[in-house]
Regions:
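NAD(P)+-binding Rossmann beta1-loop-alpha1 motif at the extreme N-terminus of oxidoreductases
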Residues: 1-48
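N-terminal glycine-rich dinucleotide-binding loop that anchors FAD/FMN and/or NAD(P) in oxidoreductases
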Residues: 49-69
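Short acidic low-complexity segments
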Residues: 65-81
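Alpha-helix C-terminal capping/helix-to-coil transition sites in glycosyltransferase folds
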Residues: 79-80, 116, 163
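Glycine-rich, N-terminal phosphate-binding loop of Rossmann-like dinucleotide-binding domains
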Residues: 86-89, 124, 171
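Rossmann-like NAD(P)(H) cofactor-binding subdomain of soluble oxidoreductases
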Residues: 91-154
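Internal alpha-helical scaffold of NAD(P)-dependent oxidoreductase catalytic cores
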Residues: 132-147, 152, 158-197
Length: 197
Protein backbone atom coordinates (compact mmCIF):
# COMPACT_ATOMS: atom_id res chain seq x y z
CA UNK A 1 0.00 0.00 0.00
CA UNK A 2 1.58 3.27 -1.10
CA UNK A 3 -0.89 5.65 0.51
CA UNK A 4 -0.59 6.53 4.17
CA UNK A 5 -2.99 4.60 6.37
CA UNK A 6 -5.88 6.44 7.99
CA UNK A 7 -6.27 3.60 10.49
CA UNK A 8 -3.82 1.18 12.11
CA UNK A 9 -5.35 -1.81 13.86
CA UNK A 10 -3.06 -3.51 16.37
CA UNK A 11 -4.06 -7.13 16.59
CA UNK A 12 -5.29 -6.68 13.04
CA UNK A 13 -4.72 -10.28 11.92
CA UNK A 14 -6.90 -11.64 14.73
CA UNK A 15 -10.65 -12.23 14.70
CA UNK A 16 -11.69 -8.80 15.99
CA UNK A 17 -9.13 -6.68 14.16
CA UNK A 18 -9.33 -8.41 10.77
CA UNK A 19 -13.08 -7.99 10.39
CA UNK A 20 -12.95 -4.41 11.66
CA UNK A 21 -10.20 -3.58 9.17
CA UNK A 22 -12.23 -4.98 6.28
CA UNK A 23 -15.27 -2.97 7.31
CA UNK A 24 -13.36 0.31 7.54
CA UNK A 25 -11.49 -0.31 4.28
CA UNK A 26 -14.82 -0.96 2.53
CA UNK A 27 -15.88 2.54 3.62
CA UNK A 28 -12.89 4.15 1.91
CA UNK A 29 -10.29 4.18 4.68
CA UNK A 30 -6.73 2.97 4.17
CA UNK A 31 -6.07 0.36 6.85
CA UNK A 32 -2.90 -1.29 8.12
CA UNK A 33 -3.38 -4.50 10.10
CA UNK A 34 -0.50 -4.79 12.57
CA UNK A 35 0.10 -8.16 14.16
CA UNK A 36 2.78 -10.63 15.32
CA UNK A 37 1.18 -13.61 13.57
CA UNK A 38 3.34 -13.90 10.45
CA UNK A 39 1.27 -16.76 9.03
CA UNK A 40 -1.94 -14.71 9.13
CA UNK A 41 -0.12 -11.66 7.75
CA UNK A 42 1.09 -13.68 4.76
CA UNK A 43 -2.39 -15.09 4.11
CA UNK A 44 -4.09 -11.70 4.32
CA UNK A 45 -1.61 -10.01 1.98
CA UNK A 46 -2.07 -12.83 -0.55
CA UNK A 47 -5.85 -12.42 -0.42
CA UNK A 48 -6.64 -15.46 1.73
CA UNK A 49 -8.77 -15.18 4.84
CA UNK A 50 -6.86 -16.55 7.87
CA UNK A 51 -10.00 -17.99 9.51
CA UNK A 52 -13.75 -18.16 8.96
CA UNK A 53 -15.41 -14.75 8.83
CA UNK A 54 -18.69 -14.54 6.93
CA UNK A 55 -18.67 -12.35 3.81
CA UNK A 56 -14.94 -11.67 4.09
CA UNK A 57 -13.19 -13.55 1.25
CA UNK A 58 -14.49 -11.51 -1.68
CA UNK A 59 -14.25 -8.28 0.31
CA UNK A 60 -10.61 -8.94 1.22
CA UNK A 61 -9.61 -9.54 -2.40
CA UNK A 62 -11.43 -6.37 -3.48
CA UNK A 63 -9.79 -4.22 -0.79
CA UNK A 64 -6.31 -5.59 -1.59
CA UNK A 65 -6.87 -4.87 -5.28
CA UNK A 66 -7.85 -1.30 -4.38
CA UNK A 67 -4.78 -1.06 -2.09
CA UNK A 68 -6.92 -0.09 0.90
CA UNK A 69 -5.72 -2.80 3.29
CA UNK A 70 -2.49 -4.62 4.08
CA UNK A 71 -0.98 -6.53 6.99
CA UNK A 72 2.42 -6.04 8.61
CA UNK A 73 4.34 -6.93 11.78
CA UNK A 74 5.90 -3.45 12.01
CA UNK A 75 4.47 -1.52 14.99
CA UNK A 76 6.16 1.68 13.77
CA UNK A 77 3.58 1.81 10.93
CA UNK A 78 1.20 3.47 13.41
CA UNK A 79 3.11 6.70 12.74
CA UNK A 80 1.36 6.89 9.35
CA UNK A 81 -2.15 6.78 10.81
CA UNK A 82 -4.55 9.18 12.47
CA UNK A 83 -6.42 6.42 14.33
CA UNK A 84 -4.78 3.58 16.25
CA UNK A 85 -7.24 0.85 17.24
CA UNK A 86 -5.98 -1.66 19.81
CA UNK A 87 -7.60 -5.09 19.92
CA UNK A 88 -4.79 -7.43 20.90
CA UNK A 89 -5.56 -10.78 22.48
CA UNK A 90 -5.89 -10.89 26.26
CA UNK A 91 -4.50 -14.09 27.83
CA UNK A 92 -6.44 -15.89 30.56
CA UNK A 93 -4.84 -17.14 33.77
CA UNK A 94 -5.37 -20.55 35.40
CA UNK A 95 -8.49 -19.24 37.16
CA UNK A 96 -9.97 -18.19 33.78
CA UNK A 97 -9.61 -14.50 34.60
CA UNK A 98 -8.11 -12.12 32.02
CA UNK A 99 -4.45 -11.34 32.62
CA UNK A 100 -4.26 -7.66 31.72
CA UNK A 101 -0.63 -7.07 32.75
CA UNK A 102 0.68 -7.83 29.26
CA UNK A 103 -2.06 -5.72 27.69
CA UNK A 104 -1.17 -2.72 29.87
CA UNK A 105 2.58 -3.17 29.33
CA UNK A 106 2.08 -3.18 25.56
CA UNK A 107 1.36 0.55 25.74
CA UNK A 108 4.96 1.21 26.78
CA UNK A 109 5.99 -0.19 23.38
CA UNK A 110 3.31 1.77 21.55
CA UNK A 111 4.26 5.00 23.32
CA UNK A 112 7.56 5.15 21.38
CA UNK A 113 5.65 5.78 18.15
CA UNK A 114 2.87 8.07 19.38
CA UNK A 115 2.25 11.65 18.27
CA UNK A 116 0.10 14.18 20.09
CA UNK A 117 -2.57 14.13 17.35
CA UNK A 118 -3.09 10.37 17.30
CA UNK A 119 -6.50 9.06 18.36
CA UNK A 120 -6.01 5.82 20.31
CA UNK A 121 -9.04 3.54 20.56
CA UNK A 122 -9.16 0.55 22.90
CA UNK A 123 -11.43 -2.15 21.49
CA UNK A 124 -10.74 -4.89 24.07
CA UNK A 125 -13.19 -5.65 26.85
CA UNK A 126 -11.31 -4.46 29.93
CA UNK A 127 -11.90 -3.97 33.65
CA UNK A 128 -12.71 -0.62 35.29
CA UNK A 129 -9.52 1.31 35.99
CA UNK A 130 -7.53 -0.04 33.04
CA UNK A 131 -8.13 2.99 30.79
CA UNK A 132 -6.78 5.23 33.53
CA UNK A 133 -3.62 3.09 33.87
CA UNK A 134 -3.06 3.21 30.12
CA UNK A 135 -3.66 6.95 30.03
CA UNK A 136 -0.95 7.48 32.65
CA UNK A 137 1.49 5.55 30.47
CA UNK A 138 0.85 7.45 27.23
CA UNK A 139 -0.26 10.94 28.30
CA UNK A 140 3.21 12.52 27.96
CA UNK A 141 3.05 11.70 24.22
CA UNK A 142 -0.69 11.62 23.46
CA UNK A 143 -3.77 12.40 25.53
CA UNK A 144 -6.41 11.26 23.01
CA UNK A 145 -7.52 7.91 24.43
CA UNK A 146 -10.98 6.47 23.87
CA UNK A 147 -12.73 3.24 24.72
CA UNK A 148 -15.04 1.67 22.11
CA UNK A 149 -15.60 -1.97 23.15
CA UNK A 150 -16.50 -4.64 20.62
CA UNK A 151 -19.62 -6.75 21.20
CA UNK A 152 -19.60 -9.02 18.18
CA UNK A 153 -20.12 -12.77 17.71
CA UNK A 154 -16.87 -14.24 16.36
CA UNK A 155 -17.14 -14.96 12.64
CA UNK A 156 -20.10 -12.65 12.12
CA UNK A 157 -18.58 -9.21 12.69
CA UNK A 158 -19.00 -8.00 9.11
CA UNK A 159 -22.70 -8.78 9.32
CA UNK A 160 -23.31 -7.56 12.88
CA UNK A 161 -21.19 -4.42 13.36
CA UNK A 162 -23.28 -2.16 11.09
CA UNK A 163 -26.45 -3.19 12.95
CA UNK A 164 -25.27 -2.77 16.55
CA UNK A 165 -25.00 0.50 18.52
CA UNK A 166 -21.39 1.41 19.30
CA UNK A 167 -20.49 2.57 22.81
CA UNK A 168 -17.96 5.42 22.81
CA UNK A 169 -16.20 6.90 25.83
CA UNK A 170 -12.81 8.44 26.44
CA UNK A 171 -10.39 10.54 28.45
CA UNK A 172 -10.96 13.83 26.62
CA UNK A 173 -13.45 15.53 24.32
CA UNK A 174 -11.32 15.25 21.19
CA UNK A 175 -10.86 11.49 21.58
CA UNK A 176 -14.57 10.96 22.17
CA UNK A 177 -15.77 13.11 19.28
CA UNK A 178 -13.22 11.80 16.77
CA UNK A 179 -13.89 8.17 17.72
CA UNK A 180 -17.63 8.72 17.47
CA UNK A 181 -17.22 10.30 14.05
CA UNK A 182 -15.11 7.36 12.91
CA UNK A 183 -17.52 4.65 14.06
CA UNK A 184 -20.48 6.56 12.66
CA UNK A 185 -19.09 5.64 9.24
CA UNK A 186 -19.74 1.95 9.95
CA UNK A 187 -22.44 1.83 12.68
CA UNK A 188 -26.05 3.00 12.65
CA UNK A 189 -26.01 4.40 16.18
CA UNK A 190 -23.39 5.83 18.54
CA UNK A 191 -23.99 5.86 22.30
CA UNK A 192 -21.71 8.21 24.22
CA UNK A 193 -20.93 7.20 27.79
CA UNK A 194 -18.34 7.76 30.52
CA UNK A 195 -15.29 5.66 31.29
CA UNK A 196 -15.87 3.98 34.66
CA UNK A 197 -12.72 4.23 36.81
Amino acid sequence: MNNKSNISIIGGAGHVGFALGLIFSSKGFNVSLIDKNRSNIKKINSGQIPFLEENSQKLLKTMIKKKRIYATNQLRKVIESKFIIVCIGTPINNKLNPNLRGFINFFYQLKKFLKKDHIIIIRNSISPGICNKIYKIIKSKCKNLSYCPERIVQGKAILELPKLPQLVSGKNKKAILESGKLFRKVCKKIIYTKVIE
